[in-house]
Amino acid sequence: MNKQYSYPLDLSWSTEELASVLSFFNDVEAAYEGKVEAKKLLDSYKGFKAVVPSKSEEKRLGREFETVSGYSLYRAVQAAKEKGEGKISLGK
């Protein structure tokens, strides 16, 4: 996958909000490119949802992120919820 892509971000977000969203995107990338603790991904998802509470906005950002990265926010969160504890890996 192309490592040179831009994250779908809203420039009206505060620095803290940007950090929360980027942390979640980074954890999703880690799940696809290696392994990440399920709890860590779910915790960063909670931070993401504090910034993006709207389901439609979450879906829009998820589509944009998947288009540029090939990584699904939805699949990563579902895998983390199913696993509960331990590490998840969605890579090949």
Swiss-Prot record:
This is UPF0223 protein SP_1404. It comes from Streptococcus pneumoniae serotype 4 (strain ATCC BAA-334 / TIGR4). InterPro entries: BH2638-like_sf, UPF0223. Coiled coil: none annotated. Gene3D superfamilies: BH2638-like. It comes from the Bacteria. Transmembrane segments: none annotated. Belongs to the UPF0223 family. Pfam families: UPF0223.
